[in-house]
């Protein structure tokens, strides 16, 4: 059998027997094709150009036939540092810069290994137990009985390319992508030599270079400098869909804009569930929106210091929620008195401005996604940015996005900055404190050819975006029966006695029966009184979100809750 190999050195082919082992294949490639210019530790075997591949030194004695290799198959060789460069870097001084500062490089995130076992999100642990196969029914091409199976009806892998194209799925789900990468990276490796298939991109200069030269900017070599950045459409997305538990959540958030005409911003709180519209998909279910202190204007919002952040997080945790994103408005009435708004964001302008993408990258860096399949223990983020704006028909619409992993890596390396043009992101200039690698972006021209362009000094911000879908459930079953956030404004506009009096009305028997406590803003207002302890607040949250007889008895048995009732009733 003849196998073909492609690498940065060109094309080559070699003849093997089906009974030859992978170890024999690697030895022949190193000697006959690479002319012993590379060591086994610096060459990886890949099935396609996007794979990380398997290092030659990790290939075992599995036969080529058992490994699934066929006559004429194209394989790819990922080449590392040649032996000549390794020898020269060990014997010769690296490039130095006279008079440069001693130490200004940033840590290489990808080199960090998790020091403790990674605790993933429950949704990730749950999806890892799913087989993820796409079931297919019998077709007219099948020639077997109901208990048989053939190529036309056998289940497909969750990352099957034909299924993705037929169903117009733009991005693979994260777990489908993970299985695709893992099957390629660890296909030939034994169970004793597992290789983490995921690695977060890093575009910073490595601090501890094995060449022994002074750190950047006093010295740099091919081992420690970041590689060229190629901006492409990210093939996967960590979150596939955003679902608002009820339309009232968005409607309540929009009320302040309707009343003032000023823009608003808020943090979304919810949880993650499996999304069945794509194989192994994840959706974020938003149950509440909290609006932090802000200065609103007609054309933007400025966030102020958030003193109650820890308390809001505590209340959210008590309700079984977590912060999953941020949402803001960009609405301008079109002046027709018909309820329609201007369409500002579309394919000919922008979807998220460069400043918004920059801020989203900042949030995604703070809220990383723990992942045991990554070398660093983290991969991507589940933090989602949603914007409420006008569509092409002048209707108010929610659109959700994430910044790609390369986008967040560029932000972490301090290589990008927003520009005055909302559709363009600037690449920063290199200086004594910042090494800037080559940045390219690739697009399809009018002739259908792939064209690469230099991203300096600026590039389209759309290359950093990942688009999500969003919507509402067919049968809403929200965690909170009441989404009115005006209670916060009412309480903040009165004195202490007035606040207690307003809260006391919510504990009336008839009011409780109508769901007065089933409101995230109300629970937060009660928590601000500092009467209930952490466990008692959790008991109140359990009753507010699930008003069962058992939860009611548990709440009434708590001394601090009775103290709260006494204080509130005394204000009436």
From Swiss-Prot:
SUPFAM superfamilies, per this entry? Answer: Ubiquitin-like
Q: Residue ranges of region Disordered?
A: 87-116
Q: Which PROSITE patterns match?
A: MPN
Q: Which InterPro entries match?
A: MPN, Npl4, NPL4_C, Npl4_Ub-like_dom, NPL4_Zn-bd_put, Ubiquitin-like_domsf
Q: What is its main location?
A: cytoplasm
Instruction: Give the subcellular location.
Output: Cytoplasm, Perinuclear region; Endoplasmic reticulum membrane; Nucleus membrane
Give the keywords, sorted: Cytoplasm, Endoplasmic reticulum, Membrane, mRNA transport, Nucleus, Protein transport, Translocation, Transport
GO CC aspect terms: Cdc48p-Npl4p-Vms1p AAA ATPase complex; cytoplasmic side of mitochondrial outer membrane; cytosol; Hrd1p ubiquitin ligase complex; nuclear membrane; nucleus; perinuclear region of cytoplasm; RQC complex
Q: Is Plastid a UniProt keyword of this protein?
A: no
Which Pfam families does the record match to this protein?
A: NPL4, UN_NPL4, zf-NPL4
Q: Which GO terms describe its biological process?
A: ERAD pathway; mRNA transport; protein transport; ribosome-associated ubiquitin-dependent protein catabolic process; ubiquitin-dependent protein catabolic process
The UniProt record lists the MPN domain at: 242-379
What is its membrane topology?
Peripheral membrane protein
Q: Which GO terms describe its molecular function?
A: ubiquitin binding; ubiquitin protein ligase binding
Family that this chain belongs to: Belongs to the NPL4 family.
Its job: Involved in the import of nuclear-targeted proteins into the nucleus and the export of poly(A) RNA out of the nucleus. Has a role in the endoplasmic reticulum-associated degradation (ERAD) pathway.
Q: What is this protein called?
A: Nuclear protein localization protein 4
Gene encoding this polypeptide?
Answer: npl4
């Amino acid at each position: 059998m003849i196998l073909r190999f492609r690498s940065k050195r060109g094309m080559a082919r070699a003849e093997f027997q089906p009974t030859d082992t992978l170890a024999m294949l690697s030895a022949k490639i190193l000697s006959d094709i690479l002319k012993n210019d590379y060591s086994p530790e610096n060459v990886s075997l890949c099935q396609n150009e996007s794979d990380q591949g398997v290092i030659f030194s990790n290939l075992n004695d599995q036969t080529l036939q058992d490994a699934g290799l066929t006559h004429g198959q194209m394989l790819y060789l990922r080449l590392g540092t040649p032996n000549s460069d390794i020898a020269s870097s060990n014997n010769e001084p690296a490039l130095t810069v006279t008079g440069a500062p001693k130490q200004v490089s940033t840590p290489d995130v990808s080199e960090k290994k998790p020091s403790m076992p990674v605790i993933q999100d429950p949704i990730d642990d749950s999806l890892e137990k799913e087989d993820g196969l796409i079931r297919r029914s019998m077709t007219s091409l099948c020639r077997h009985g109901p208990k048989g199976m053939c190529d036309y009806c056998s289940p497909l892998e969750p990352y099957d390319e034909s299924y993705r194209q037929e169903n117009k799925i733009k991005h693979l789900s994260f777990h489908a992508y993970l299985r695709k990468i893992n099957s390629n990276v660890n296909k030939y490796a034994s169970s004793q030599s597992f290789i983490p298939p995921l690695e977060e991109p890093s575009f910073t200069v490595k601090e501890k270079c094995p060449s022994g030269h002074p750190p950047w900017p006093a010295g740099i070599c091919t081992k420690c400098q970041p590689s060229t950045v190629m901006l492409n459409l990210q093939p996967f997305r960590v979150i596939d869909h955003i679902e608002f538990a009820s339309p009232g959540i968005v409607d309540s958030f929009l009320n302040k804009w309707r009343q003032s005409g000023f823009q608003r911003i808020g943090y979304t709180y919810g949880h993650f569930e499996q999304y069945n519209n794509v194989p192994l998909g994840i959706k974020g279910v938003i149950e509440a929106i909290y609006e932090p202190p802000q200065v609103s204007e007609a054309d933007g919002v400025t966030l102020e210091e958030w003193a109650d952040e820890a308390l809001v997080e505590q209340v959210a945790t008590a309700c079984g929620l977590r912060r999953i994103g941020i949402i803001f408005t960009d609405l301008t009435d079109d002046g027709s008195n018909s309820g329609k708004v201007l369409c500002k964001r579309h394919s000919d302008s922008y979807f998220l401005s460069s400043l918004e993408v920059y801020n989203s990258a900042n949030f995604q860096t703070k809220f990383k996604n723990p992942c045991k399949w990554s070398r660093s223990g983290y991969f991507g983020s589940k933090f989602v940015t949603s914007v409420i704006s006008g569509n092409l028909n002048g209707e108010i619409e929610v659109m959700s996005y994430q910044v790609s992993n390369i986008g967040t890596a560029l932000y972490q390396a301090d290589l990008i900055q927003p520009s005055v043009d909302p559709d363009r992101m600037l690449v920063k200039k290199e200086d004594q404190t910042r090494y800037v690698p080559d940045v390219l972006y690739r697009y399809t021209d009018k002739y259908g050819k792939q064209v690469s362009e230099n991203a300096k000094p600026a590039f389209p911000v759309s290359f950093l975006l990942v688009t999500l879908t969003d919507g509402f459930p067919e049968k809403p079953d929200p965690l909170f029966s009441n989404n009115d956030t005006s209670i916060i404004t009412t309480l903040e506009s009165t004195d202490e006695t007035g606040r207690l009096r307003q809260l006391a009305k919510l504990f009336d028997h008839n009011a409780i029966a109508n769901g007065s406590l089933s409101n995230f803003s109300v629970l937060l207002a009660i928590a601000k009184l500092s009467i209930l302890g952490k466990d008692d607040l959790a008991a109140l949250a359990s009753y507010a979100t699930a008003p069962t007889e058992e939860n009611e008895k548990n709440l009434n048995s708590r001394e601090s809750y009775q103290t709260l009732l006494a204080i509130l009733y005394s204000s009436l």
